[in-house]
Amino acid sequence: ACLVGSEMCIRDRYCDYFNEIGKRCQQNGMKFGYHNHAHEFQKVEDKAVMLDYMIENTNPEYVFFQMDVYWIVRGQHSPVDYFNKYPGRFTMLHIKDHRELGQSGMVGFDAIFNNAKTAGVENIVAEIEDYSCPVMESVKKSIDYLLEAPFVKASYSK
């Protein structure tokens, strides 16, 4: 039982809700996933980190997690640490940087791609949220970065 209105109670209800929605999706040939941002790294009632609690209290049969690597880093955590802590739970990877992919140096794409198998990555989505140049040039820089990065090729040749 939880105290009605407490953050812990609300958190428990969300996990139960996600499990139920995920189960219904599975029964209808779909998948249900959750995409993080930086606020999931706040502690709830000074206890667990919200993202950890969600991963630990949702059923992997019903709920997958799409890791947004940029927001993990902005939340002051390591994507690879999460891969190792929760292997197989991140079947979708959302790669993003401050601007064009690989330009800020803050995300650590080499370690992310080298450990994608541990994460359970099946699909990757790339996003450019902000641009340092015209949009099409920004997209080209990001695509070129992915095509030329040796760790991207290495992680998919295994």
PLM regions with names:
Residues 1-5, 9-10:
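Single conserved hydrophobic/aromatic residue that forms the stacking wall/gate
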Residues 3-4, 27, 88, 141:
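Generic structural microfeature
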Residues 6-7, 27-40:
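Active-site groove signature of glycoside hydrolases
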Residues 9, 33-35, 64, 92:
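Intrinsically disordered, low-complexity regions enriched for glutamine and histidine
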Residues 13-28, 57-58:
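An active-site-proximal structural segment forming one wall of the substrate-binding cleft
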Residues 45-67, 71-158:
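Histidine-acidic metal/acid-base catalytic patches
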